[in-house]
């Protein structure tokens, strides 16, 4: 049986890597840039670091920054119109998952005008044409949208996060520059770091995992447990760089094998209560891992992880002790970076659980979970996460 892996054409990684953008734009003979970011990054001067690179080589660009933290259909449709008006031939996106996901959605519609109804992109999109070229420079260390075939857009009317999966949307270039991540506020660094951990853990235990994805996910897990607290609490440059690497290689893995029900549940919290995605994952991860660990094969995967992150004694523990230890280590890391909230703190109400569970049942991440889950079990998992 063959293994298919889809990645960027080219990737750059390291402090100051954004300078590579100039050479790539010249080499590919692009004439004008449509720059996609968000207002916070523009105000903080982060987007300006990339604008400096563009100005050095004299390439014209138009800036689009009308993007919400949970980007909406309107953010995309307005962006498409702005991109058309600009006459650009390449999109450069600077930001976290919000900016990158919006840029990817815009790029798909630009070359697939028959899919201008953004709702038609939900799930497996099956678009006909390769997206308009996108070069992605992440400013957060979590979503890995710069290397994935996924993007998430919120349908505000239906209160649903649309997980759009399309091999045509992967950016041609990913430039992971930890200097662009250094300005992240502590809370955002913690949230995106726990998002990256969720990607790596869910990717490692997902039903479709393989030897290649295992390699990426295990390395990401080790890097995150070792470096996240220092990256968040001390902004230690090497730790920030290592978390940037961890989130990227986790994305290399999960984009090709899928995720699980932590994401199925987190998407609904974001759509209904506007809960930040990384925080939602952090709050749900321990509860869901305890549930998934009841599958003996998954408990063994937890055992393998523990042996690699400083608990070699896990090789001799029974499954229940393995589950308890792994869940405890996740919870302790979350506390260490300042995430101590529950879904109740973000507005979750028990009377909403049936509705949330129904939506989670239809989420595209659900099929990847290593254990089957019913609507009733989703309700109970939300209840336990309170």
Regions found by a protein language model. Name each.
Residues 1-64, 385:
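An N-terminal, well-structured beta->alpha segment
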Residues 18-21, 43-46, 73-76, 98-103, ...:
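Short glycine/serine/threonine-rich phosphate/pyrophosphate-binding segments
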Residues 42-115, 229-240:
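N-terminal small/polar loop signature for handling phosphorylated ligands or for N-terminal nucleophile
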Residues 150-257:
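Carboxylate- and glycine-rich phosphate/diphosphate-binding segment that chelates Mg2+/Mn2+
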